[in-house]
Amino acid sequence: MISSAISSIRAQLVDRRIKLQDTVREIKNPANLISLLNEVDSALERMDNGTYGLCEVCHDPIEDYRLQQDPLMKFCLDHLTTKQQKELEQDLKLASKIQNTLLPRNNATVDGWEYFYHYEPAELVSGDYCDVVSTDKNSKKQFFIIGDVSGKGVAASMLMSHLHAMFHSLSSINLDVHDLVERANRLFCESTLSTHYSTLAIVLANKSGEVEICNAGHCAPLLIKKNQIIKVDATGVPIGLFCSSEFGVNKYKLESGDSIFLYTDGLSEAHNHDQEYGENRVMNVAEKIKTFQTKQMISAYTDDLTSFLSGSLKSDDLTMLAIKKL
């Protein structure tokens, strides 16, 4: 775990220690709190002697996301008790169910746009973010959002849920893309650890086909038009890195039949035994699917990826979102 993350956790533990000490003085039977206070002191001591974050059995590093969830963790996954392993499995299954409820409805049309997405976690939970958010009813605009949170596992899935809540709250204010992303960046930066960030690609589309796209350090969205394919490169850094970051926006006009394809690096950085899938292959598939409906577009990519992998396992979350102007 990098030093900035440990410094942030140390600050949390010191604050927790002060609050526990105050509470212990105020209650009559503080035995449980004293035990917790001892655990906090032990964690701070491990930070001082350089053993914090190392499993007390095998001395290998404890998974970062688990330390971020519980800074008092002493054992890696391989050395949890049977009871702890079962509890972890139950927590993961519950987290997966909750995450699935946050996904938008699929294979739908909304205000002149058709969309379809593919959402495939590498494990039970995902750090990918996929959403379709309506602005106020009068404006007839939709936000199509895809993102990839740093890290993996439960910690990343919790940050994905955080993004979901932020954007659903901010969308009700009827902001343009620029202001939306800047506010989201500031909120995300102020409410998470300094090591947390998320790439994002956000499309604001209106009924007439006008779109605004902001790419915050994400894989380049593709505008798939009849005679050309346009890559929308990054117009800013991932959100959460710097609280005062600025983000550029590109504007386009799409005609009926034009599409936008968004994806996470689970596609472009997928590997078989010999090579990476790569952005060039993403572009090559796009050339072949210009006239496809959104569901067919996604199927073309999943089929091509399966063929490319040739039995190799996927190692990262995979999300793809296709949008088409009707």
Language-model-detected regions and their locations in the chain:
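Interaction interfaces in information-processing and related assembly proteins
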Residues: 1-49
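Short, cysteine/histidine-rich loop/knuckle motifs that typically chelate Zn2+
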Residues: 56-58, 78
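Short Cys/His-rich "knuckle" micro-motifs
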Residues: 65-71, 85-88
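Regulatory cytosolic signal-relay segments
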Residues: 77-128, 220
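PP2C/PPM family metal-dependent serine/threonine protein phosphatase catalytic domain
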Residues: 111-126, 181-191, 219-250, 279, ...
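Acidic loop->beta-strand submotif enriched in PP2C/PPM serine/threonine phosphatases
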Residues: 124-127, 133-134, 198, 232-274, ...
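Catalytic core of PPM/PP2C metal-dependent serine/threonine phosphatase domains
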Residues: 154-233, 247, 299, 309-310, ...
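Active-site-proximal, acidic helix/loop segment immediately C-terminal to a metal-coordinating Asp/Glu
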Residues: 155-173, 254, 259-312
